[in-house]
Swiss-Prot record:
The gene is MB. Monomeric heme protein which primary function is to store oxygen and facilitate its diffusion within muscle tissues. Reversibly binds oxygen through a pentacoordinated heme iron and enables its timely and efficient release as needed during periods of heightened demand. Depending on the oxidative conditions of tissues and cells, and in addition to its ability to bind oxygen, it also has a nitrite reductase activity whereby it regulates the production of bioactive nitric oxide. This is Myoglobin. One of its GO terms (biological process) is oxygen transport. The lineage of its organism: Eukaryota, Metazoa, Chordata, Craniata, Vertebrata. It catalyses: Fe(III)-heme b-[protein] + nitric oxide + H2O = Fe(II)-heme b-[protein] + nitrite + 2 H(+); H2O2 + AH2 = A + 2 H2O. It comes from Canis lupus familiaris (Dog). GO terms for cellular component: sarcoplasm.
Amino acid sequence: MGLSDGEWQIVLNIWGKVETDLAGHGQEVLIRLFKNHPETLDKFDKFKHLKTEDEMKGSEDLKKHGNTVLTALGGILKKKGHHEAELKPLAQSHATKHKIPVKYLEFISDAIIQVLQSKHSGDFHADTEAAMKKALELFRNDIAAKYKELGFQG
């Protein structure tokens, strides 16, 4: 399940493009998540009042949270699978405080892929998509294992 050095390099290359505008990418990821899976919005008290895409686009709080999400994910990706220290507190908060099901992590992974395809179509080739999907799956599997350790059946 691990990624090769070459696959990690591909992931980090495309992630470098994301880092030029973490807040913008993050906001777009969350908007796609909420549009594609409106039930996920119930987990975000801060954003429940945002009913339209325009309201979401105008929300500085949504943009800030998108930045937070992608900053955390970038820190994990840069560890190239050696992300135990970064993952533990994230799993803890998402299992015990936020109660985010693993399924929702799949949904946001899909949204990330869609945003990368949309914003970086010239650089997001089949090998890039495959490597990123593999990295996100590794992240989700490791979060799911932590959830299990914590007794969260998300």
